[in-house]
Amino acid sequence: MTQAAIDYNKLKSAPVHLDAYIKSIDSESKEGVVKIRGFANTISKDRAGDVIPASAWKTSNALTNYMKNPIILFGHDHRRPIGKCIDLNPTEMGLEIECEINESSDPAIFSLIKNGVLKTFSIGFRCLDAEWDEATDIFIIKDLELYEVSVVSVPCNQDSTFNLAKSMNGHDYTEWRKSFTAISSKAVPAQERNLSELEKLAIALGYVKE
């Protein structure tokens, strides 16, 4: 199986988290509520080399289920709802969002958002269809289902495997890493392969078997 096929299967089998930024905060809204606006996702290439074109947000699967219960979470934690989405608007630039964050849900997080310390959105979604563009080495996500929108403290790491680790549970991540390593040339030592430092460390510590 090629690396492209492995990455495609990863997209199809696990929730994915991508980031964008909060662009405005309205602190003059009703007491105990702050309204935030921005892009939950943009059409730009993300750190993992994936792109969600504007057309993907207009499919019948993309937003229907989420809008039945448009909760905003903190840090992708389903136990920490902090507000609700009041408007989602697919545009040519990406998925524009407007939310109300409630102070009563988490006063500390509310304060950090209101004071501009927390200013990043992240979405969790399931990829339903994608294609790999060999010329640009990116995955174009053509159809998806939005699971949730979160306010997060730190955007996804540049290392795509770290991004994947956050979007899978520990067992699934370990199994994926094993299958990833199995694709590599068995006759070539880890030190001589084109591996990231994270991959070499995982092999050295025994988390991934050669």
Curated annotation (Swiss-Prot):
Gene Ontology cellular component annotations, sorted alphabetically: virion component
UniProt KW keywords: Hydrolase, Late protein, Protease, Serine protease, Viral capsid assembly, Viral capsid maturation, Viral release from host cell, Virion
Entry EC number(s): 3.4.21.-
Transmembrane residue ranges: none
Domain of life of the source: Viruses
Chain positions of site Cleavage: 23-24, 166-167
GO terms under biological process: proteolysis; viral procapsid maturation
Enzyme class: hydrolase
Principal location listed in the UniProt entry: virion
Residue ranges listed under propeptide: 1-23, 167-210
Residue positions of the active site: 76, 122, 148
InterPro entries: Peptidase_S78_dom, Prohead_protease
Location of the protein in the cell: Virion
One example GO MF annotation: peptidase activity
Effect of substituting residue 148 to A: Complete loss of protease activity
Coiled coil stretches, renumbered: none
Recorded family membership: Belongs to the HK97 prohead protease protein family.
Protein name: Prohead protease
